[in-house]
């Protein structure tokens, strides 16, 4: 069993924001498998898919980003998924828009959702798929207002190309493992 978690903020006002790109990737995965999210046994929405004879739980925490660890730990306990079966999908302000980076483990790198998951698990030993959101054309003055802001039209065009690649990268992790997916997807997309 694999658990793929997309990070974001639950309220409708955050839909389409840069910080919710993890939710966007999970929504694309669910649509690909023609399934819908329902209320889980914890503070999350989940759905189950099967891909190449592998069971996968897709999960969207319904906590705010900075408290994502509670939902992740609850789901890991309920579904009996170990760290090796966990993949977190989140935005990354340190990566330029149009790029993704898969890692087998590592620090939070300034991403507060990852930071809380690491705190709750007491470990950095889980896979993550980081989706770049840093603008190429302007400096940032306020990180929080930027990540909570909606994508510009130009950024949306880039994300429409990136999100399907993220979907395929996540499925590659499920089937072939994180190392294989890193070799295939850790390169610029745009």
From Swiss-Prot:
Main localization of the protein described in the UniProt heading: cytoplasm
Enzyme class (EC, first level): hydrolase
One matching Pfam family: Pept_tRNA_hydro
Localization per record: Cytoplasm
Keyword set includes Nucleus: no
Catalytic residue list: 19 (proton acceptor)
One GO-annotated biological process of the protein: rescue of stalled ribosome
SUPFAM superfamilies from the UniProt entry: Peptidyl-tRNA hydrolase-like
Binding site for tRNA: 14, 64, 66, 112
Site features described as Discriminates between blocked and unblocked aminoacyl-tRNA, chain residue numbers: 9
Site location (Stabilizes the basic form of H active site to accept a proton): 91
Domain of life: Bacteria
Molecular function as annotated in GO: peptidyl-tRNA hydrolase activity; tRNA binding
Family per similarity comment: Belongs to the PTH family.
HAMAP family: Pept_tRNA_hydro_bact
Subunit structure and binding partners: Monomer.
Name by which UniProt lists this protein: Peptidyl-tRNA hydrolase
Provenance organism: Chlorobium phaeobacteroides (strain DSM 266 / SMG 266 / 2430)
């Amino acid at each position: 069993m694999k658990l793929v978690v997309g990070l974001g903020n639950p309220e409708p006002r955050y839909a389409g924001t840069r910080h919710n790109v993890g939710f966007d990737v999970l929504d694309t995965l669910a649509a690909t498998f023609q399934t819908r999210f329902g209320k889980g046994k914890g503070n999350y929405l989940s759905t189950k898919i099967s891909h190449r004879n592998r069971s996968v739980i897709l999960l969207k925490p319904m906590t705010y980003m900075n408290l994502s660890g509670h939902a992740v730990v609850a789901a890991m306990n309920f579904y009996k998924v170990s760290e090796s079966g966990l993949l977190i999908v989140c935005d990354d302000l340190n990566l330029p828009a149009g790029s993704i980076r898969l890692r087998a483990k590592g620090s939070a790198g300034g991403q507060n959702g990852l930071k809380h998951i690491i705190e709750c698990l007491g470990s950095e030993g889980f896979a993550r798929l980081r989706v770049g959101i840093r603008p190429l054309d302007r400096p940032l003055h306020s990180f929080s207002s930027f990540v909570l802001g909606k994508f510009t039209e130009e950024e949306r065009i880039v994300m429409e190309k990136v999100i399907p690649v993220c979907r395929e990268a996540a499925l590659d992790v499920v089937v072939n493992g994180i190392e294989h997916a890193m070799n295939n997807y850790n390169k610029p997309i745009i």
